Curated annotation (Swiss-Prot):
Function: Functions as an intracellular arginine sensor within the amino acid-sensing branch of the TORC1 signaling pathway. As a homodimer or a heterodimer with CASTOR2, binds and inhibits the GATOR subcomplex GATOR2 and thereby mTORC1. Binding of arginine to CASTOR1 allosterically disrupts the interaction of CASTOR1-containing dimers with GATOR2 which can in turn activate mTORC1 and the TORC1 signaling pathway.
Assembly and binders: Forms homodimers and heterodimers with CASTOR2. Interacts with the GATOR2 complex which is composed of MIOS, SEC13, SEH1L, WDR24 and WDR59; the interaction is negatively regulated by arginine. Interacts with TM4SF5; the interaction is positively regulated by leucine and is negatively regulated by arginine.
Major location category of this protein: cytoplasm
Protein name per its UniProtKB record: Cytosolic arginine sensor for mTORC1 subunit 1
Gene: CASTOR1
Pfam families referenced in this protein's UniProt entry, alphabetically: ACT_7 (PF13840), CASTOR1_ACT-like (PF21389), Castor1_N (PF18700)
Binding residue positions for L-arginine: 111-112, 274, 280-281, 300-304
Amino acid sequence: MELHILEHRVRVLSVARPGLWLYTHPLIKLLFLPRRSRCKFFSLTETPEDYTLMVDEEGFKELPPSEFLQVAEATWLVLNVSSHSGAAVQAAGVTKIARSVIAPLAEHHVSVLMLSTYQTDFILVREQDLSVVIHTLAQEFDIYREVGGEPVPVTRDDFSNGFPRTQHGPSPTVHPIQSPQNRFCVLTLDPETLPAIATTLIDVLFYSHRTPKEAASSSPEPSSITFFAFSLIEGYISIVMDAETQKKFPSDLLLTSSSGELWRMVRIGGQPLGFDECGIVAQIAGPLAAADISAYYISTFNFDHALVPEDGIGSVIEVLQRRQEGLAS
């Protein structure tokens, strides 16, 4: 398998809901006029708490500082796994890289963020951790770093100043999980048809002002949650929204898999997770991989979100609760 270190240098930001008005214009520019901003990595996720942005340096320039904008200190690099094997159908999403990427990085105390899209899964690691990442994964992968759009082979020797942090850290924190009742769909869209849904997209993201129902509370089973994720990365669009929101969009323009599968969410974290703790993604992806359950995974500024097949949500909750009980004991 190949691991590609993409050229994007990404910043992770949070826009507070009361301050969204200040960022509507630059966000619309990034959404609909990417050539003007030269932004090639743009992701916007609405949650009950805030709007999380993952943007490259060109996109970051478009966002003015304000009291409503929080910026994570680190610059993040983007990793992507490609497999050329003609393997039989297997679990998709973060599950397929849980053992080969997520678990080893957690063992070596590398904090990761995940962004699953319709097309692929992006793994974000802090720039300062790159040497550790390469040393950790070089045995498993052929590693390439994109330079000027071309893949250049990378070896351990190229990053000889970093070595795996093999010391045992503290036991992973057991984070509570919630499963809201929404049913979600994962969709894509031909970028040429984006203008046709622009009005609806702007309304849903900026002007609907939906009130989250218990979503930010400590209730173990919130009835529903405000969640909408849009990404435009290297010309490819991915959208995650609940089935009710999808009804607002023209059905002939949004594309999904032939099965039209719906997904349920597992939300990770009772308090904001922060960026320093390692193993949060592994805590979820590992048990799902062991059970061969497909999952999309989207990290945000405060919490993490896994999407699993709707018909398997009961077994997923059972698997994760068993894992939590094991960690807590």
